[in-house]
Amino acid sequence: MAGRELSHLQQLEAESIQIIREVAAEFDNPVMLYSIGKDSSVMLHLARKAFYPGKIPFPLLHVDTGWKFKEMIAFRDAQAKKFGFELLTHTNPEGVAQGINPFDHGSAKHTDIMKTQGLKQALNQYGFDAAFGGARRDEEKSRAKERVYSFRDRHHRWDPKNQRPELWRTYNGAVNKGESIRVFPLSNWTELDIWQYIYQENIELVPLYFAAERPVVERAGQLIMADDERMKLEEGEAIKYEVVRFRTLGCYPLTAAMHSQADNLEKIIEEMLLTRSSERQGRLIDSDQSASMEQKKRQGYF
């Protein structure tokens, strides 16, 4: 009897689960990077499916910059409690001691010290030899050319000219001591795939993805949410309440909201079918300079 043909989402799911299982079997000390966003939520769901009814056999790591939305941190802790996975958090102590923040030091320095350096500290501290990330190739041009198994040297740096071939879904995970692999099981998914899968699987998300009235400040043509008392207003700025949602999440001073009436999954999917702009246009760190994402990844960024 002929086998049942898999749907597009089922094919993506099967591929991702196979990658997750292969990494768990092949590497000595893997970890899943958990940024709390929609892609991380899908990746967590896939990991739970991959090892059901057992528990996820590796920890989740959140690199906390201290500037995430309050709702993100509350959601992170609630998910860890609900599903019982091991959650590791790390904040760069040197950055905290220096008082590094996105307002006074700018997005580039804040991101480098609190995210890139913080991530490298955590990977070194625990000795992880593989780290899952939720990046997708459709997000940004430097990610479009990255392999599923992305080799990193002893300093966690990525060299786009020194990548390994991946033929017929055959992945090379061989590393020497101190080297590691970043693994991207969602590489072949699109933003629309992510949202349709979230709808199909009824995956919980941070409420910030859904339209609601929120306090925002308009700055350089972008809407920045005033998430707490640390929000610094520039001359002539005022907080106003607008119906907005977030297409992508990060540190709140560096993440722009968008006007939207999409307050449920069906409306978000409809919005995605009509949009012609990149989801990362709301990430202010991507506009630091030309090719900034590739430069960050070369230095060890996610």
Swiss-Prot record:
Catalytic activity: sulfate + ATP + H(+) = adenosine 5'-phosphosulfate + diphosphate
Gene Ontology terms for molecular function: ATP binding; sulfate adenylyltransferase (ATP) activity
UniProt pathway annotation: Sulfur metabolism; hydrogen sulfide biosynthesis; sulfite from sulfate: step 1/3
Entry protein name: Sulfate adenylyltransferase subunit 2
Keyword Oxidoreductase: no
UniProt keyword list: ATP-binding, Nucleotide-binding, Nucleotidyltransferase, Transferase
Subunit record text: Heterodimer composed of CysD, the smaller subunit, and CysN.
Broad class of enzyme this protein falls into: transferase
InterPro entries noted in UniProt: PAPS_reduct_dom, Rossmann-like_a/b/a_fold, SO4_adenylTrfase_ssu, Sulfate_adenylyltrnsfr_sub2
Job description of the protein: With CysN forms the ATP sulfurylase (ATPS) that catalyzes the adenylation of sulfate producing adenosine 5'-phosphosulfate (APS) and diphosphate, the first enzymatic step in sulfur assimilation pathway. APS synthesis involves the formation of a high-energy phosphoric-sulfuric acid anhydride bond driven by GTP hydrolysis by CysN coupled to ATP hydrolysis by CysD.
EC number(s) on file: 2.7.7.4
GO biological process: hydrogen sulfide biosynthetic process; sulfate assimilation
Keyword Cell inner membrane carried by entry: no
The family this protein is said to belong to: Belongs to the PAPS reductase family. CysD subfamily.
PANTHER family cross-referenced by the UniProt entry: SULFATE ADENYLYLTRANSFERASE SUBUNIT 2
Organism, scientific name: Shewanella oneidensis (strain ATCC 700550 / JCM 31522 / CIP 106686 / LMG 19005 / NCIMB 14063 / MR-1)
Region (Disordered), start-end ranges: 280-302
